[in-house]
Amino acid sequence: MSIIQEFKEFAIKGNMMDLAIGVIIGGAFGKIVDSLVKDIIMPLITVITGGGVDFSQKFIVLGANPNNLQSLDALQKAGINVLTYGNFLTILINFLILAWVVFLMVKLLNKLRRDKNEPEAPAATPEDIQLLREIRDELKKQA
């Protein structure tokens, strides 16, 4: 089978549309998580830690700082090499939250699929039917 034929089958089956929709929703969801971390979680962490922690301003100056600049913006504008580990921590928190939410969504979808695919348990045999079967079996043994 040629690669073009495989691509046509892939596109016709709807997998391409599913993928496109997933990418679009994923991009929008990523923005929601970014906002959650930046606008809600990080300010709460700052308040909990007594206002002294602002991850966006956490950095280490790598190399010489001849003008003794103190702010991250000033250091970056001056072209001084800066290790911005606070930004990394914020992105790491974003990732962990996003991974957790995706995990919960997959877990929920798997549970819903499992519930759909499980065959229904057969209904319990009523007592009178069970009694009639036992009587029939006894009569067969005696005959």
Curated annotation (Swiss-Prot):
Membrane topology qualifier: Multi-pass membrane protein
GO MF term list: mechanosensitive monoatomic ion channel activity
Keyword Transmembrane attributed: yes
One Pfam family cited in the UniProt record for this chain: MscL
Keyword NADP: no
GO cellular component, one term: plasma membrane
Keywords: Cell inner membrane, Cell membrane, Ion channel, Ion transport, Membrane, Transmembrane, Transmembrane helix, Transport
Location of the protein in the cell: Cell inner membrane
Regions that span the bilayer: 10-30, 40-60, 86-106
Subunit note: Homopentamer.
Homology family: Belongs to the MscL family.
HAMAP family: MscL
NCBIfam families: mscL, PRK00567.1-4, PRK13952.1
Protein purpose: Channel that opens in response to stretch forces in the membrane lipid bilayer. May participate in the regulation of osmotic pressure changes within the cell.
This protein's name: Large-conductance mechanosensitive channel
Source organism: Acinetobacter baumannii (strain ATCC 17978 / DSM 105126 / CIP 53.77 / LMG 1025 / NCDC KC755 / 5377)
